[in-house]
Amino acid sequence: MKGQETRGFQSEVKQLLHLMIHSLYSNKEIFLRELISNASDAADKLRFRSLSNPDLYEGDGELRVRVSFDKDKRTLTISDNGVGMTRDEVIDHLGTIAKSGTKSFLESLGSDQAKDSQLIGQFGVGFYSAFIVADKVTVRTRAAGEKPENGVFWESAGEGEYTVADITKEDRGTEITLHLREGEDEFLDDWRVRSIISKYSDHIALPVEIEKCEEKDGETVISWEKINKAQALWTRNKSEITDEEYKEFYKHIAHDFNDPLTWSHNRVEGKQEYTSLLYIPSQAPWDMWNRDHKHGLKLYVQRVFIMDDAEQFMPNYLRFVRGLIDSSDLSLNVSREILQDSTVTRNLRNALTKRVLQMLEKLAKDDAEKYQTFWQQFGLVLKEGPAEDFANQEAIAKLLRFASTHTDSSAQTVSLEDYVSRMKEGQEKIYYITADSYAAAKSSPHLELLRKKGIEVLLLSDRIDEWMMNYLTEFDGKPFQSVSKVDESLEKLADEVDESAKEAEKALTPFIDRVKALLGERVKDVRLTHRLTDTPAIVSTDADEMSTQMAKLFAAAGQKVPEVKYIFELNPDHVLVKRAADTEDEAKFSEWVELLLDQALLAERGTLEDPNLFIRRMNQLLVS
């Protein structure tokens, strides 16, 4: 063949093929769903390009997918008259995987086949799924608008390499022929193929036809029979659509192997006319935190496909939402740039955002277990919401979940509504603490008094939490209060000090002055506190001071971190504080104060600038 060359697969493709053939074999029929789905996408792309260039139809505007098989040759063929591919596109799409981060993702997969099948399915198996049942795959394609002699041939046994060549192909589109492996004869059975198409592809908006051979007057007459409904699912009445159809449609548009958690299908008429079908996945995409991660909705205008991944219709903190919007108010020649600056887009975005938040609120109310699955997968993303979307902040806050001292578990299951319902009489604020880990938050000395008083504290240990709490200032009219910041309401919780205790504290004034003189500018202030029950000392920050966790975030991002000036608070009832106060020798007094400060800093920050000095100092005091 002209222009024939043999090329090696990108290493990631080889890995994917190996994993997929072994992990997805138990559900091997999905290859047909994937190939028909790709053919449908090719038809969508042709329709879109034809808006500006009708000649691409080449006089054939009846788009369809055809499935045929040859029992003698043991081949199954899926063909379409969609947009087709050029030689360069064939090499790009069938020889490589363009997604960044693919290599590390594939390397992270283990030998657990159940887990692998979920993850690989979520990855979007697409064209390569053909190799689950075929030991050789042949592709013949020609791009719309190209001359017949610019057709392309591609063939591979799915091992290490593939062959590509130039051919003549009269009709545009793509034809994929699967040379079935031994033992895969079920895919040469007419009834079996029909049932798979009905199961997985009934929602495809263009006809899926199967070859029908009949004997008439001694001759074999070939015709094509439509198997699916061939009506865009979102245009049908909700009452006519089964849950199974909604799930299969999700798998088609999201290229996901798993069922969605929930969905919402709505048709809006009036000032704005649009139909939306929005899904919440059950599992986060493997590349969700990758900056190149594609997200957004499929955009249709008057049922004509316009683009994938239209990000403009959903805020970033809802980037996990999949689905589509079909608008009657946008023009067919709309571009991403026009969408960016469109009043229609902004109105649609606001409406769809509210719709998703309502969908999540309903899920949380109706099925707490499913909502917990959602939170485990997407909670970190939703936590970006309070900073991004002030208008919907209260609705987002209702959806947040936290660990707390009430549950004694690291699971984030407590809602703010739960917390408020359990607030003590006279309690005006919602108390929380941020730390590097759940264990550090739970054991913080800042919690001692609150625990004694039976007051619940939210335990926040995700990196995003401190940043989120800078924007989330109140809920249900009640302000949030970090227990690691100095606050009058925390001091008010302490038991009232009797006269004799007040006299004893007065006697400690010279001690406090000595500590201030020793530490100088290293701390903002030194004072006595009644917030502690078991701990000798803590460090706190003023309300207007940067918190410890925020300083860590700045440092991790490579930003210049302003020095955090702590308030050093001492427990007058603790034996170590009394011992330090009674020490007259200045050198030993200095050692005691430095040790107490280091302990407080270690509890607050988790690290010390000079841990060896801390250990030496502690050892000296232990033997003295």
From Swiss-Prot:
Region (C): 553-624
InterPro entries: HATPase_C_sf, Heat_shock_protein_90_CS, HSP90_C, Hsp90_fam, Hsp90_N, Ribosomal_Su5_D2-typ_SF
Keywords: ATP-binding, Chaperone, Cytoplasm, Nucleotide-binding, Stress response
GO molecular function terms attached to this record: ATP binding; ATP hydrolysis activity; ATP-dependent protein folding chaperone; unfolded protein binding
Compartments it resides in: Cytoplasm
Region A, residue ranges: 1-336
Region (B): 337-552
Keyword Ligase: no
Gene Ontology terms: cellular component: cytoplasm
Main localisation: cytoplasm
Family named by the database record: Belongs to the heat shock protein 90 family.
Self-association and partners: Homodimer.
Its biological purpose: Molecular chaperone. Has ATPase activity.
Name the UniProt record assigns to this protein: Chaperone protein HtpG
Species of origin: Shigella dysenteriae serotype 1 (strain Sd197)
